[in-house]
């Protein structure tokens, strides 16, 4: 790469950053950061821990955007200074190092822009992720356990905390259903890309004849709404609350007391379970919070569906809405049907490397908004 080409690239990066700045409203974000940090010095700040944590999360999110922008602009300034130095006094090792920095910088801008894509009203929230098998008994239940591990690994690799809220093991192997609470900034923003039906094609380890089987599992993802975000009144006459013994994937308190809670909301048929806490009271509180989140999400989806009908759009629903195929046999390939993103690195994906699929989905969503 010639120095003249490096100069052109750096000028393009600077122009790109100028365009980004035009849409960021940095001054307003910096003012908000200052206001949040003043709130955090108040002696009564932690009186309401939920509200306090919400302010901290919002402040951290703003600082990440603002600091990220300045880090990128400083990097361009540093690379430009190095290029000017090379122009005056050439050094081959320094030039090679600069070339690497320039080439890597494009990826840094891409990652920063991806962060900016998560600007939906609930993208910053924690996420509630549920997995359920399709028809097929043990084969589909085993597929759920594989997806469960994939999401757990993805969360570990990306700094999200995972809590197993509800877990029902399969009769022979696998999982009949599992609900995860995934905590971390933008957890919903990223994981909403996984909502839909996941299809597996492989030689079944449960088939003595070694035949190829196709299995399905559904993944549902909704935001974990804070109580102050939603206004949902639940009529006590509309719900039934049952207690049962926890049946989790392990743990000292499993099957000792009937601390687990199941709430059935009869008007909608929504059922939520919680067995994550040791006490029945805490499980009930958590289950009610999850029910409110589901009812609120249902309300939002109904409004979205009404708007889609007005616009003449039709969305796939149910088991027909396959978003991704995982083919292990007769060849190795994982393909996302929404974006055409694909890879032959099956083991890596099943070990949690689903970032490229999520990024491709978010970029497609951004492109559709720009049209």
Swiss-Prot record:
Signal sequence segment: none
Record PTM: Methylated by PrmC. Methylation increases the termination efficiency of RF2.
For this protein, what is any one GO molecular function term?
A: translation release factor activity, codon specific
- Which Pfam family is one of this chain's hits? PCRF
PTM annotation (N5-methylglutamine): residues: 252
User: Which keywords does UniProt give here?
Assistant: Cytoplasm, Methylation, Protein biosynthesis
Q: Where in the cell is it found?
A: Cytoplasm
Question: Cytoplasm as a keyword?
Answer: yes
Under the heading InterPro entries, the entry gives:
PCRF, Pep_chain_release_fac_I, Pep_chain_release_fac_I_sf, PrfB
SUPFAM superfamilies xref list:
Release factor (SSF75620)
**PROSITE patterns per the record?**
RF_PROK_I
Among SMART domains, the record links this protein to:
PCRF (SM00937)
Could you name the Gene Ontology cellular component terms for this entry?
Answer: cytoplasm
Its GO biological process annotations read:
viral translational frameshifting
| General function of this protein | Peptide chain release factor 2 directs the termination of translation in response to the peptide chain termination codons UGA and UAA.
Annotated family: Belongs to the prokaryotic/mitochondrial release factor family.
> Any other comment in the entry?
The gene for this protein contains a UGA in-frame termination codon after Leu-24; a naturally occurring frameshift enables complete translation of RF-2. This provides a mechanism for the protein to regulate its own production.
The record's annotation in NCBIfam families points to: prfB (TIGR00020)
Q: Protein name, please? A: Peptide chain release factor 2
Q: Which organism is it from?
A: Staphylococcus epidermidis (strain ATCC 35984 / DSM 28319 / BCRC 17069 / CCUG 31568 / BM 3577 / RP62A)
Organism phylogeny: Bacteria, Bacillati, Bacillota, Bacilli, Bacillales
């Amino acid at each position: 790469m010639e120095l003249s080409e490096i100069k052109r690239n750096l000028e393009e990066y600077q122009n790109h950053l100028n365009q980004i700045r035009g849409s960021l409203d940095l001054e307003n974000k910096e003012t908000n950061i200052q206001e949040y940090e003043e709130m955090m010095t108040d002696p009564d700040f932690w009186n309401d821990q939920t509200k306090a944590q919400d302010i901290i999360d919002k402040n951290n999110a703003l600082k990440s955007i603002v600091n990220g922008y300045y880090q990128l602009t400083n990097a361009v300034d540093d690379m430009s200074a190095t290029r000017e130095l090379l122009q005056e006094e050439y050094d081959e090792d320094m030039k090679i190092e600069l070339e690497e920095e320039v080439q890597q910088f494009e990826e840094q801008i891409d990652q920063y822009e991806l962060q900016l894509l998560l600007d939906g009203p609930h993208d910053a929230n924690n996420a509630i992720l549920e997995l359920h098998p399709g028809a097929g008994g043990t084969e589909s239940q085993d597929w759920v356990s594989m997806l469960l591990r994939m999401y757990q690994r993805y969360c570990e690799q990306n700094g999200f905390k995972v809590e197993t809220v509800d877990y029902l093991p399969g009769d022979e192997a696998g999982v009949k259903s599992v609900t995860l609470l995934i905590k971390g900034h933008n957890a919903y923003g990223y994981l909403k890309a996984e909502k839909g039906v996941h299809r597996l094609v492989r030689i079944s380890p449960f088939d003595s004849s070694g035949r190829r089987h196709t299995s399905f599992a559904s993944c549902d993802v909704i935001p974990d709404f804070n109580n102050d975000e939603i206004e949902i009144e639940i009529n006590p006459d509309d719900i039934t609350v049952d207690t049962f013994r926890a049946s989790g994937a392990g743990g000292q308190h499993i099957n000792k007391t009937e601390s687990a809670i199941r709430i059935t909301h009869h008007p909608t048929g929504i059922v939520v379970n919680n067995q994550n806490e040791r006490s029945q009271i805490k499980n009930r509180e958590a289950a009610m919070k999850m029910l409110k989140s589901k009812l609120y999400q249902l309300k939002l989806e109904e409004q979205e569906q009404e708007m889609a009908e007005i616009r003449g759009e039709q969305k796939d629903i149910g088991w027909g809405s396959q978003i991704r195929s995982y083919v292990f046999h007769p060849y190795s390939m994982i393909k996302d049907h929404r974006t055409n993103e694909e890879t032959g690195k099956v083991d890596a994906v099943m070990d949690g490397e689903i970032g490229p699929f999520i990024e491709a989905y978010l970029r497609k969503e951004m492109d559709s908004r720009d049209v």
